[in-house]
Amino acid sequence: MKKENKSVIIWLLSGCVLLFLMVVVGGITRLTNSGLSMTDWHLVTDTFPPLTDAKWQAAFDEYKKFPEYQKINIHNDFQLSDYKFIYFWEWFHRFIGRIIGLVFFVPFVYFLAKKKLDTSTIKKCIVLLAMGAFQGFLGWFMVRSGLIDNPDVSHFRLSLHLTFAFITFAYTLWVALDLIYPERNINKILPLRNIARYALAALLIQIIYGGFVAGLNAGLIHNHWPLMSDGEFIHESVFIEQSSLIKNLIEGKSGVQFVHRTFAYAVVAVILFLFFKSKKYTLTRTQSNGINTLVVFVFIQFLLGVFTLLYSVPLALGLIHQIMAFFLLSAMTYTLHRLSK
């Protein structure tokens, strides 16, 4: 690491921490059914929550016009105090998004003015800023889907929002790693790099399906392992909830859960393959540490997934499972970087 890059690295890693925090709060927002509490979006006027009783009541009255209240919460003795709870989590999620925007943009302008960024890093940072702006759009695009008729957001949009947050985090970490390890890696092992790429692709597919499971509440059924309900590996409901096999596998609760729980074995398998294949090569310390950490994390994540399913997605386990996915992606990004650069 070059000394002149230290402040830029700290900036990028701070962004990673904030992105991690935002996904954690996003997970709490989803698991507490708070995501539809703010029914519009304003860049400036939503910066702070309502500060008077009258403004709180006005926000609550506006919320009552939308499907989540009219079809669900109206039957649950839902009071203003309940509304304040769900409002807080959605507001906090958006507030962190605004902080992230400032943390990325203001120092970027400063580093540009001080000429602390080379041309390559400038281009990467511009991509990061664009990704952040697009992520904000995806968040509102997701929320809008739950404000029309169905009081649930589209699981496709939720998964897109979630997965793109993971990708933005991974790319931010990658840019930071480029500065932490500016020297070219003379121990670049192409076979391992290619396997790591497949592992990353498998992990991203699993994250996408994790979003599907979350959006459809598919973790609340077939709460058994290693088999589904009735002691079946593939329960009959996997094939009958939707009109076609493809629809069952991307829209049916049972089908989506089946893919997510089964594909977990594939993720574990490809990472184990990377681990055992790496034993045939002489690795650097960072390469070895990355692969070893990856193996530990994938087994922890697998077990968390099993227990989250068995206990029907309690808030704590569901959140820890999502957090562990972040750590797993971090280890995957680090490992691939050390095998590639």
UniProtKB/Swiss-Prot annotation:
It catalyses: Fe(II)-heme o + 2 A + H2O = Fe(II)-heme a + 2 AH2. The chain crosses the membrane at residues 8-28, 92-112, 126-146, 160-180, 201-221, 256-276, 294-314, 315-335. Its EC number is 1.17.99.9. Its cofactor is heme b. Pathway: Porphyrin-containing compound metabolism; heme A biosynthesis; heme A from heme O: step 1/1. Heme binds at residues 260, 321. InterPro entries: COX15/CtaA_fam, HemeA_Synthase_type2. Keywords: Cell membrane, Heme biosynthesis, Iron, Membrane, Metal-binding, Oxidoreductase, Transmembrane, Transmembrane helix. It is found in: Cell membrane. It is a multi-pass membrane protein. GO terms for molecular function: metal ion binding; oxidoreductase activity, acting on NAD(P)H, heme protein as acceptor. GO terms for biological process: heme A biosynthetic process. One of its GO terms (cellular component) is plasma membrane. Its main location: membrane. Coiled coil: none annotated. The keyword Membrane applies. The keyword Glycoprotein does not apply. Catalyzes the conversion of heme O to heme A by two successive hydroxylations of the methyl group at C8. The first hydroxylation forms heme I, the second hydroxylation results in an unstable dihydroxymethyl group, which spontaneously dehydrates, resulting in the formyl group of heme A. Belongs to the COX15/CtaA family. Type 2 subfamily. Interacts with CtaB. This is Heme A synthase. It comes from Flavobacterium johnsoniae (strain ATCC 17061 / DSM 2064 / JCM 8514 / BCRC 14874 / CCUG 350202 / NBRC 14942 / NCIMB 11054 / UW101).
